[in-house]
Amino acid sequence: MGANAQKETLKFAPQWFPQAQFAGYYVALDQGFYEEAGLDVKILHPTDDESSMKLLRTGKADVMSSFLMDALSARLSMDIPLINIAQLSQHSSLMFVTKAKSDIDTITELDGKQVAIWSAGFDRLPKALMKEKNNEVEFVPIYNTINLFLEGGVDAMTVMYYNEYDQIINSGVNKEELNTFFFSDYDGFDIPEDGLYCLEHTYRERREDLKKFVRATLKGWNYVEQNKEYALNLVVERMDKAHIANNRAHQRWMLNRMLDLLTPGDKDVKRGHLLESDFQRALNVIQSEARSGAEMQKIKFNDFYKPFAD
């Protein structure tokens, strides 16, 4: 595209503060992939007062990233007309951890225990898994710390493999001192996470811009795979600018785990795409957790998922 050509502004809201989880977007912006596609992309991270969902709903953002479960739930129970335009993560990174000395060696032994869980969402899948296992647990809400678990205030903690698990290890706990229960190991609970979403009217009105954004983003992630230290430099720069404490080793761990999640592995799906079976799996969990008699919207796969990846 010529240097003087008009570029279309597109505002993107990741679902969390700056970290390696979003390295592909930073790289696509810094390398000029968005600009080459004719886009002027603005990355708007959420704040304590405005979530990425709020930024999207109020028109301050055109596209957001979100977990599949969260987006599908918002569409079904809150009637927010979200469209999945790309599925980046292909697996779940959620897990429970316990201390080996707790003698909680199997997931059924969580019955009657206290489990720390984030107060800012992410609770639907852990609760559904406990229900599936007929476990009665007390979920203890926390914000953004591993201290309660480290100090023995709870028996277990819900963590992301790419994030809090490594924080626990970095705090001085050896891997051998932990028992781990990966949701991806349990039938029906390996539900993909990060995807890209827009509202229905944005999809109707800006399809070409959305396609360009998705493909430039995937190009950014492909570049990250071959240039990890450069990508980490951008991540740390973003975190420093946002005055967020950071640890390069931890961000490197997160980056590598995110790249793992973007890789389909033995799944019959191309990068950037969503399997209908994964959609159905997420839908099954949401419907099983719906309160008795609750009215929920019905949705078909092809109405929710309209991909722009190659």
What kind of region is each of these model predictions?
Residues 1-9, 310:
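Short, low-complexity disordered leader/linker segments with a strong preference
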Residues 29, 37-38, 60, 65-68, ...:
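Sec/Tat-exported extracytoplasmic proteins
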Residues 27, 94-104, 191-208:
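A bilobed periplasmic-binding-protein/Venus flytrap-type ligand-binding module shared by bacterial periplasmic
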Residues 277-310:
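Conserved C-terminal helix/tail region of periplasmic/extracytoplasmic solute-binding proteins
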Residues 6-142, 146-159:
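Short, glycine-/small- and polar/acidic-enriched structural segments
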Residues 136-139, 175-180, 241-257, 291-300:
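Short, surface-exposed acidic
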Residues 205-288:
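Secondary-structure end/capping motifs
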Residues 81-89, 138-140, 175-191:
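Short beta-strand->loop
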